[in-house]
Amino acid sequence: MSGFFTNLFQWFSGLFFSKKAEISVVGLQASGKTSFVNVISSGQWSEDVVPTVAFNLRKVRKGNVTFKIWDVAGQPKFRSMWERYCHGVDAVVFVVDSTDQEKFESARFELHSLLNQPALSGVPLLVLGNKNDIDGHAPVNELIRSLELSKIQGRPVSCYSCSMKSQHNLDIVMQWLAGRSH
């Protein structure tokens, strides 16, 4: 019977003390966007991730925050959809494969093109340099330079090096995201 009252109390508290955040996860193909969503929702990383077609939507509860997460495909034919799924969100997460430095120029172009859309004015940006468990990955200062993050004005911008596979730095990423909740 005490379990019933505990559940009732948790449900009731959630009505008054819970927060929400809507997040869009974008980036070039094979950067780790879906792995990011999978790891934060289930705590599990898998090598067998099917490329996203168009988008996936997930709701994830972490502590007292419920995240509505748009995982948007990164292939060139889907990039024109990014703005639609970033409109009205509390934060944009841009995932970069930090081991594939040949794609940094393309990633920079796509990121700045997205952020120049008037509908995204002021939306906080979190850049994740994924795959830091692999030798030769670019450190944060290289990501900041290559993606020209210092040129981004009028919005909070943060950049972290992380690994979905080892879950390195995902705790601080989740703290950052929770800070965008309301």
Model-found features: residue ranges?
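TRAFAC-class small GTPase G-domain
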Residues: 1-182
